[in-house]
């Protein structure tokens, strides 16, 4: 499954005194099996971009093509339904949208709406919940008797229960404790590597971006100003400063180390493990 943006612009309240162009002339492509991160300041157009992915918003100008379906501002919703079935959208604080009295009913709400096999959906959701640390009897419990972090994980899995090919998540770990953050991020990564799903992550946490993403899309004032690998992105401190993007902690540590020892390691470390490996190599060659 491939999603392609061709010269996509979106204007809110078009034709009124309050009209605002949130994204303009966006050209990019999302491929199944890859992990994308979308970063940029608040108001840079990230949320508008992802809402055009499955036509929650339709382009004011330009086209979004999902496999053989082309979406424009004129496309009727009945032609978009197959797209929405294959693209799972998890917005910020999804726990606020929980409403069923048991976890099981919450899990089958989406699949039932799309006339999917409910037993398969329940089994798939149960496996994902177990991966997130829930007990085996979780399906019979009420989500409203759980902690905020547990409710967040329940809400995320309720979207994943539809087994979408492309998963779009907007700040999924905001406000979670460190263990829950790791569980959610590792689950998303495993869905990419083990099930060939595309992950599209909006995040302000550059540590997550560095560790998990294959490609990073940087947005500024409604435009894509960069689309590259994390290693290439975090090499250019001047551009990062201009885009108001912080360095990941491990990359900052590497730069501090290099400055202190007046040296240059052979590569950019995106994880603690990679930094340790580069450090050992540097020690060996001293």
UniProtKB/Swiss-Prot annotation:
Keyword Transport appears in the UniProt entry: yes
Domain (ABC transporter) ranges: 3-246
Signal sequence annotation: none
GO MF annotations, alphabetized: ATP binding; ATP hydrolysis activity; ATPase-coupled transmembrane transporter activity
Superkingdom of origin: Bacteria
Keyword annotations: ATP-binding, Cell membrane, Membrane, Nucleotide-binding, Translocase, Transport
GO cellular component labels: ATP-binding cassette (ABC) transporter complex
Pfam family, one: ABC_tran
Record function comment: ATP-binding (A) component of a common energy-coupling factor (ECF) ABC-transporter complex. Unlike classic ABC transporters this ECF transporter provides the energy necessary to transport a number of different substrates.
Name the record gives this protein: Energy-coupling factor transporter ATP-binding protein EcfA2
Organism in which the protein naturally occurs: Staphylococcus aureus (strain bovine RF122 / ET3-1)
């Amino acid at each position: 499954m491939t999603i392609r943006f061709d010269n996509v612009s979106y204007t809110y309240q078009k034709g009124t005194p309050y009209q605002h162009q949130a994204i303009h002339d966006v050209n990019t492509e999302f491929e199944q099996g890859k992990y994308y991160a979308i970063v940029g300041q608040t108001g840079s157009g990230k949320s508008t971009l992802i809402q055009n992915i499955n036509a929650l918003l339709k382009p004011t100008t330009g086209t979004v093509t999902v496999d053989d379906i082309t979406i424009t501002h004129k496309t009727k919703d009945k032609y978009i339904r197959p797209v929405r079935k294959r693209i799972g959208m998890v917005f910020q604080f999804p726990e606020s949208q929980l409403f069923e009295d048991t976890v099981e009913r919450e899990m089958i709400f989406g699949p039932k709406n799309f006339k999917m096999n409910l037993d398969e959906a329940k089994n798939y959701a149960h496996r994902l919940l177990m991966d997130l640390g829930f007990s085996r009897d979780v399906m019979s419990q009420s989500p409203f008797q759980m902690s905020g972090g547990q409710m967040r994980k329940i809400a995320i899995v309720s979207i994943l229960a539809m087994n979408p090919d492309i998963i779009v998540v907007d700040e999924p770990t905001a406000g979670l404790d460190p263990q829950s953050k790791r569980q959610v991020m590792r689950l998303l990564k495993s869905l990419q590597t083990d099930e060939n799903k595309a992950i599209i992550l909006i995040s302000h946490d550059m540590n997550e971006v560095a560790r998990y993403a294959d490609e990073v899309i940087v947005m500024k004032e409604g435009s894509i100003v960069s689309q590259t690998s994390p290693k290439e992105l975090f090499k250019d401190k001047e551009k990062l400063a201009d885009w108001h993007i912080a360095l990941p902690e491990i990359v900052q540590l590497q730069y501090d180390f290099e400055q202190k020892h007046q040296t240059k390691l052979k590569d950019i470390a995106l994880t603690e493990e990679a930094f340790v490996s580069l450090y050992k190599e540097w020690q060996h060659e001293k």
